[in-house]
C-alpha cells in the first residue's frame, strides 16, 4: 500500500521509512503469534456496518481477513467468499459465536450498543464476545483504520495487542503512535 502511494506521490522521501516500519511491525507481530495453535486462536467478527435494519461483515475476500490473519486470529466469517462487505443475520453470528467483535468506523455503533441490545431487535447476549465484554470499537486515525492506509502498521499493532494482550504487554500503543 505504501509503495503504491509512493508511485502516486514520488517526491515524498518518507516512503522507505514508512515501508520499513510497516514491515518491522508485521514481522514483530508474526514472530509473537506464530506459535499459537490453530484451535487456540481467537475467532473474531468484524461488524462493518450496523443499524436497526441490517448488519454487515467482512468475509474471506475483504480487509477483515487480512487483519485477522496478520494478528494471529481467525475471521469468524471467513466461510463467506464474497468480495467486500456482506449482509449477515443474527443466526449466522450465533453459529460463528466469535470470541471477540471489532466494530469498524463505518458505523456509529459502539460496544455498549451490543452489550445493551440498543439497536434493532438483535439479541447479542448469547454471543461469547458480548458475554465476556470483548467488543471493541476500532480506533480512528488519519482515516478509518479498517481500510489499508497510512495507519496500517499502528492498526496491526493495536489489533495484535487487543487480541493477545499477554503477548504484547510490553507495547505502549500511545508511544508507538507518537513515534510513528
Each language-model region and where it sits:
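N-terminal ligand-binding lobe of clamshell/alpha-beta domains
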Residues: 1-180
Amino acid at each position: 500500500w505504501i509503495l503504491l502511494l509512493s508511485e502516486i506521490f514520488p517526491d515524498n522521501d518518507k516512503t522507505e521509512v514508512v515501508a520499513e516500519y510497516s514491515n518491522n511491525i508485521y514481522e514483530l507481530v508474526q514472530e509473537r503469534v506464530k506459535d499459537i495453535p490453530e484451535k487456540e486462536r481467537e475467532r473474531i467478527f468484524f461488524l462493518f456496518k450496523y443499524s436497526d435494519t441490517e448488519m454487515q461483515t467482512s468475509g474471506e475476500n475483504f480487509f477483515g481477513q487480512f487483519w485477522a490473519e496478520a494478528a494471529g486470529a481467525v475471521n469468524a466469517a471467513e466461510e463467506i467468499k464474497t468480495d467486500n462487505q456482506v449482509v449477515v443475520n443474527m443466526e449466522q453470528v450465533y453459529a460463528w459465536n466469535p470470541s471477540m467483535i471489532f466494530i469498524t468506523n463505518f458505523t456509529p455503533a459502539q460496544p455498549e450498543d451490543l452489550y445493551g441490545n440498543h439497536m434493532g431487535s438483535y439479541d447479542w447476549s448469547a454471543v461469547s464476545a458480548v458475554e465476556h465484554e470483548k467488543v471493541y470499537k476500532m480506533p480512528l486515525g488519519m482515516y478509518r483504520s479498517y481500510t489499508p492506509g497510512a495507519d496500517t502498521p499502528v492498526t496491526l499493532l493495536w489489533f495484535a495487542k487487543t487480541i493477545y494482550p499477554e503477548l504484547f504487554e510490553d507495547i505502549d500503543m500511545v508511544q508507538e503512535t507518537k513515534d510513528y
